[in-house]
Amino acid sequence: MGWKEAAAPVLTRMPAVERPEGHVPFRRKMYWTGGVLVLYFFLTNVPLWGIQTAGNDFFGQFRSLLAGGQGTVLQLGIGPIVTASIVLQLLGGANLLGLDTDNDPRDQAIYQGLQKFLVGVMVVLTGAPMVFLGNFLQPSQQLAQSMPGGAFGVEVLIFAQIAAGGILLLFMDEVISKWGVGSGIGLFIVAGVSQSLVGGLVFWEGGVGSQGLLPTWFDIIVGNVSNMPPLLSGSGIEFLLMQAGILGLLTTLFIYVVVVYAESVRVEIPLSHARVKGARGRFPVKLIYASVLPMILVRALQANIQFLGQILNSTLASMPTWLGVYGGNGQVTGGLFYYLAPIYSPNAWMWWTSGATAARWQVLIRIAIDLSFMIIGGAIFAIFWVETADMGPDATARQIQNSGMQIPGFRKNQGVIEKVMERYIPQVTVIGGALVGLLAVMANMLGTIGNVSGTGLLLTISITYKLYEEIAEEQMMEMHPMMREMFGGGD
């Protein structure tokens, strides 16, 4: 008996959100999407009951990307979902699952059940060390005195809350995927990054360097900034670029323009209908063919590596210096985990500034590792993404063949169409994945409004762009119901 036969009775009965029986009207989809987003914002502001303080956010640079809230019910964010996706993509890429998710409905149900099971496992593997080992969430000593089991009982209560939040986020994503518009994970990332961007623009407390861009410039204009250097001097230019937020603003605008332009760059393969004379179309192969979503997987892998370092630092009595050196604030400052940590702000690599602590050679090695990790990892995960999302040459050729279309000048044969697609899709996938990885590192190094991670900004712009396209498509199907069949919208 294989693993499928043994696991099928359990995996096919995993809880799931029921699929709609027919076409869901656009307005109802927007209601579902808006309702889930309101619930998401509510949960990111519900503090965990039983913690002493939220503590230092050791994963602040990944917070917007993982769409979580420090010290809240959504402490884990989409981390377990993304990590489970990484495991599934690696297993599927190595052909170890033996599942035909394209043609066999039973294998599809097993795959979806396996995904939910792995998410549950990752919730435990991520949440348990965070509560019981890492001291990231300190239990309230006052509550521990009146709680059965003392501090351990409070820790169990905290773990139950973040585990429930992680599982609830999985089903919220499923609700949007089946009943709403877009992807739940994508919308949660957009929501988290948008909060940071708005705060980076209008936050009015904390003084220059820690408040928003608009209040900072208001203080500069009215002369409300103490010890401000002459603006035309070297220190004044550094002040304008770094503390006044000019560099972050320019980087944000630059990334926005590049991503929107890259989304519009495409190779269009002409198509014609085999039976309907004059019916023509084009199949677009975009420069960012795999989208920027594979970057979530790359950054999540980096986040898990840093999480392992934090766990080792808090549990080992004396951590080897070659492995990692951690400061009083919990941030890594040396060792292997330092070089594997992503660059997430200008201060992390500008060794000539006053706040720099690392030597030039250390910074250069770290930049080289981060660039290599993101560019190579972006290309590899883009390939995995294309294959698992049925966007590869074989799946695309099959979809074109089944739609009755063909490439003019070629025989109406799936193998012929596949060979034409192989000229473009694999190469564009690798180039697009590497380009997105490079842009993510550049955005992190130069800084953005609200200190949003470069990957989070890339994802937000790209997801918003695709969401706009999806909404336009949905409205077209509402206006012309006959278009649903062409887009696969059902009855």
UniProtKB/Swiss-Prot annotation:
Record note on quaternary structure: Component of the Sec protein translocase complex. Heterotrimer consisting of alpha (SecY), beta (SecG) and gamma (SecE) subunits. The heterotrimers can form oligomers, although 1 heterotrimer is thought to be able to translocate proteins. Interacts with the ribosome. May interact with SecDF, and other proteins may be involved.
Keywords associated with the record: Cell membrane, Membrane, Protein transport, Translocation, Transmembrane, Transmembrane helix, Transport
An example Gene Ontology molecular-function term: signal sequence binding
Transmembrane stretches, start-end: 21-47, 59-87, 110-134, 153-177, 184-202, 245-266, 292-313, 366-385, 429-447, 453-467
Originating gene: secY
Purpose of the protein: The central subunit of the protein translocation channel SecYEG. Consists of two halves formed by TMs 1-5 and 6-10. These two domains form a lateral gate at the front which open onto the bilayer between TMs 2 and 7, and are clamped together by SecE at the back. The channel is closed by both a pore ring composed of hydrophobic SecY resides and a short helix (helix 2A) on the extracellular side of the membrane which forms a plug. The plug probably moves laterally to allow the channel to open. The ring and the pore may move independently.
PANTHER family in UniProt: SECY/SEC61-ALPHA FAMILY MEMBER (PTHR10906)
Family membership noted in the UniProt record: Belongs to the SecY/SEC61-alpha family.
Keyword Transmembrane helix annotated: yes
Main location: membrane
InterPro entries for the chain: SecY, SecY/SEC61-alpha, SecY_CS, SecY_dom_sf, Translocon_Sec61/SecY_plug_dom
Name of this protein: Protein translocase subunit SecY
Record's bilayer topology term: Multi-pass membrane protein
Superkingdom in the source lineage: Archaea
HAMAP family in the record: SecY (MF_01465)
Topological domain ranges for the Cytoplasmic compartment: 1-20, 88-109, 178-183, 267-291, 386-428, 468-491
The keyword Repressor appears for this protein: no
GO biological-process terms attached to the record: SRP-dependent cotranslational protein targeting to membrane, translocation
Intramembrane-annotated stretches: 59-66, 67-78, 79-87
Entry-linked Gene3D superfamilies: SecY subunit domain
SUPFAM superfamilies assigned to the protein according to its UniProt record, in alphabetical order: Preprotein translocase SecY subunit
Extracellular compartment spans: 48-58, 135-152, 203-244, 314-365, 448-452
GO cellular component, one term: plasma membrane
